[in-house]
Amino acid sequence: MITAIGLMSGTSCDGVDASIIKTDGVKKVEFIDNYYHPYEKKFRFRLKELKEKINQFSDIKKYRPDIDTLERELTLIHVKTVELLRKKLGSENKKIELVGFHGQTIFHSFKDKKSIQIGDGKLLSQLLNQNVVYNFRKKDISNGGQGAPLTPVFHQLLKNYLDFDFPVAFINIGGIANITYLNNQKILSFDTGPGNFLIDSIIQIKTKNEIQFDNNGDLAFKGTVDKNILETYLDDPFFSKSPPKSLDVNDFNISAIRTLKLEDAVATFSEFTVQAIIRSLNFLDPLPKKIILCGGGRKNKFIFERLQKLVKKIEIQKIDKYKNIDGDFIESQAFAYLAVRTLKKIPITFPETTGAAEPLVGGDLVLVK
């Protein structure tokens, strides 16, 4: 069993999720602790501003000085996060053997065969004096994979930990939503569509950043879904394409919805997330007995209640319902687990999860000298 820290900075750019787990990288896991370190407002703004500038791969070179500056700052914030988590642990922190460092995605495009995360794994290792695994997506993409999603093999571990019956599905509603379907030895995973990103973006635009997200789905409940705009979004070829498949937050344009009032825009994008998830179920045979919701979107009552109403034959639950699981830290826990698998040379991506040519051990490993 190896004790590892996982670090995740998601599409919301709000801060660093950090988790400590102990695992053998295969079947056993102990959840030790979690910690969230928020970004300062100015840094968050600069990070989001950079992401908005990068719409194509050529923009990486164009904005390289800005990227390098932010990468160093982001790495130092991750260092501070680990130090604070170590302090929280006290003497137990000496048992930490490995750090899984995802970094911050600034560009993801399967078409370009590129997925760029900023975060200096070598600097992180040097400053923390810890073994570090980073660059988790690179090897998968270079071998024909989508580079996403990466959490399915961790969902498989959770299924065993929670002793669920087959078939079961985990749906993570982050910036982008993705699904992992498990049935005996079968594992299938793909992005379903937008999660919170479009909802958050239109709220931030229309409120000039006074409101960051739809707390409990309150805005969506007050609005009316524009069915014509919704159907236009759902007509995108992505939704009829067979998995595996992945998305980036820039794959959907929000211009069509800018003319709507705030509540209607939020209701329309929230329903878009719901309908995209429902369409993803068409690729699952047989249907899962249970769907487990993870990620920030599980807290959105509008999305949760709409899914429960429209998907009547499947039990839908939030992962927090189950023993000692905190749904806010699934991805950070996953990257701790993926780091351990990488260290032990066990595959983290598969043809059925990313479309890679073969099961692959991913991630660059930096060992302390």
Label for each model-derived stretch:
Residues 93-102, 287-297:
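Short glycine-rich phosphate-binding loop at a beta-alpha junction
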